[in-house]
Amino acid sequence: LNELMYQTGNPDLKLSRQVTANMQYNWIPRRNFSTTFFAQYFGEYDLYVPVFTPYDGGKALLRGYDTDGTYHRTQVGLSFNLHLAGNKIQLAAQPSVYFYRMTGHYDISKTPFSIHTSATFYLNDFYFQASYQTPERTVQGNRAVYYKDRDFYQLLAGWSKCGWNVRLTAINMFRSDWIGATQTLNSPLYSETRLVGGNYFHRRLNLSVTYTLNYGKKVQQGNEVGEQSGAASAIMK
């Protein structure tokens, strides 16, 4: 990589074994309210991870990979959806907790909390939405990296009629920097923190104008802003 860091391969690397399990329970006590409990597990065994050893008499480091690690990721959460005022107001929230555990060459334990929320209001042909998402914090197994991005918030206003849909979205309007995430690696001989740039978490305005042609097949319009309906599930990323 540079004069202080060299890299080598490992022909003895083995394939890892993976296990995935999912559980979900939906509860709809009223027509305008629904909730979902979900739990998900992902395990990876004998995964390869980066290892660092002294090189050239300790003047540099040699980066390689070894099959030495076990990775566990469990997510437990709830999803709520509430419709008010004849479905003109829709509220949604999805709080969840992750349990990360990594053993072997790296000993990592993290328990981050996250929540996604949104509120949508429909007024005749107009619709408005506000949404917020906490930073995502994950442990990336094969890289032994702790990853944390930024929180995300947006305001949306739109108009839809006769096949036309015009939407204006204001995203992260109070954030002027271009930092998207941080990645941290800690090992006995080497540690690093990387800043990941990008425009996804930077402030911006998006304007969208679309027109739907009702030809040949009946087209169902509506749900312009991802209207919440029924109980939602979640997928781990």
Model-predicted segments: where are they?
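Electropositive, surface-exposed helix/loop patches at the edges of structured domains
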Residues: 20-28, 205-212
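Transmembrane beta-strands of outer-membrane beta-barrel proteins
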Residues: 24-26, 36-40, 77-79, 92-96, ...
